[in-house]
Amino acid sequence: HSHFPIAMHAMKLGKAVYVEKPLAHSFVECDLLMKAADKYGVVTQLGNQGHSTVKYHQFKEYVETGVVKDVYKVVAHMNNARRWHKWEGRLAKLPGPERIPATLDWDTWLATVAHHEYSSDYVMGEWRAWYDFGSGCMGDWGAHLIDCVHQFLLKGDLPNEVRVLNTKGWNKFVYPMDSTLA
């Protein structure tokens, strides 16, 4: 949630930026970042360590040589046992306030997000699960799972259609435990 405002501020200062995912919280923020890079004439890079792997370059070669062509459907999944959050759709309200640790500047951590009372459920790896702070499993892993498709098959364009087929553990506060998109 803080990558966008920090990157915007740095570009306004004329600084080149390297930003790890999640880059932004919305397509609008991504568009604003691209426009700011052009406006301020700075170099930008989104970090994705997958671009350093052999399989990334191998897939690129497969597309360029025609081994992979005429793709009409992509199915990507992540079945790693890592938990995304502990609530599994049972969360009825936001967590109650806790004492802010002396080592944390909570207002700075919130960045541009609307005020929330501090809870340890928002920090460390848990921030990824909350709509206000993270981007869920798809935001964390989608960049890795569909990066080659986006880069080499769609050539940087967006897909024509994305359908939600399943959202397990959906809640108005946190992202689903898993989802199926087509």
Where in the sequence are the language-model features?
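A structural signal for well-ordered alpha-helical segments within the folded catalytic domains
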Residues: 4, 8, 31, 53-57, ...
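Short, solvent-exposed loop/turn and secondary-structure capping segments
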Residues: 4-9, 29-30, 56-57, 84-90, ...
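Beta-strand-loop-alpha-helix segment that lines the small-molecule cofactor/substrate pocket
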Residues: 4-52, 64-66
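A generic secondary-structure signal for well-formed alpha-helical elements
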Residues: 15, 34-37, 41, 63-71, ...
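Structural recognition of the beta-strand scaffold that forms the well-ordered cores
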Residues: 18-19, 25, 43-46, 72-76, ...
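Rossmann-like NAD(P)H-binding beta-loop-alpha module
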Residues: 55-109
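Rossmann-like dinucleotide-binding domain that binds NAD(P)(H)
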Residues: 100-103, 107-182
